[in-house]
Amino acid sequence: MNFKKLLALTFASLAMGNVASIAQITPIDQCNVKDMTMCGSDLYVATNEGYLIFDTKVGETKEMKTVGNLMSIIAKSETDLWYTVNLGMSSTINHVKGTETTTYSVANGAIKGGQYADVRARGLAYGPNNTVWFGAYGFFHKFDGKEWTNYTCPASNFGRINYKCFAFDSNGTVWVAGSDQQKNATFGEFDPVKGEQTPVACDFADDGVNSMFVDANDNVWIGTDKKGFYKYDGSTFVNYNKDSEANIDINIKTSATTGLCQAANGDIYYAFNKSLVCFSGDYMVVAGTVTNEDHPRDAITCLFPYGEYIFIGTSETGVHCYNTTTGEITQLADGTPVVSAISNVNTDKTKTSNATYDLSGRQTKNLLKGQIYIQNGQKFFNK
């Protein structure tokens, strides 16, 4: 980003009442990413200073808001978004609607449940019937457009549960997950009418849960801190980790996961340290790494899938974009467009042809051992 652009964004932020200085506004290629979401071609990036809106087609930061240490963000448009701000022993939940921002918290009486009800607020999610959900320390909350309803669930043997993951299936079932102070997980189905959670016994109960989503077949996928990831079909869990037969990559030496998600082609992705891992359903392999010799401690913090792309948030080098078709990783920066258009998965030749293609989309008949290829829309590893 050039200096004039940065200065203009700074004054715009100050004019809107955000106390900020140039030094406090970190560009998209250097920021500490906490969460991401997408609207059209605009990527919304939550950081420890506020949030950025980056146009991925043009390759330009459209807006910067220095509103504090964000933990979570969701958006329907540039003028309709939610974010949570961590204040230490409390949080605020903020709704931007048009030119107005409404703040909800225990301090202003909007969030009920006592002094801890908004601590560590995160996991913002849109639910059925235009509801908004978030989790906190010992509580999770639902907004129906007018007011918040807070739900208190039983504490574990090690204290309150910090709820941070929500997922919704096609039947409207609410799946919730979190961890207590000793990183013991809870996972289960929640009935918002009765206000009751039905816990599901799982073998990751002694681990932390950090991500969760529901696929098109209503399977629930859960990412854990150190036991790999799980697929739950409503009755049975299947675990995938570094010791699974599906792991054919010697570089996957840990079962830690971050940011479990699913790409448009059906592949599952997660991260550990600086590596992005792809699980095709048959195999696990490192799809790429985020490396920068000037930032040896950099690590992937979150993932966000968008069409054929996986956006990768990091702790020190901002956002990177992985193209699931070409296998290329590009660091986002002003002046670097990364999304030209979202490909229709039904018209991409690599997804409809019996021919074999490499990850760059080139047709090939000479298959090399140890490489990944595409045929009929499915990636496979040539042993």
Task: Please tell me what each predicted stretch does.
Residues 42-45, 81-83, 131-133, 173-176, ...:
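Conserved beta-propeller blade signature
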Residues 18-23:
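Sec/Tat signal peptide C-region and signal peptidase I cleavage site
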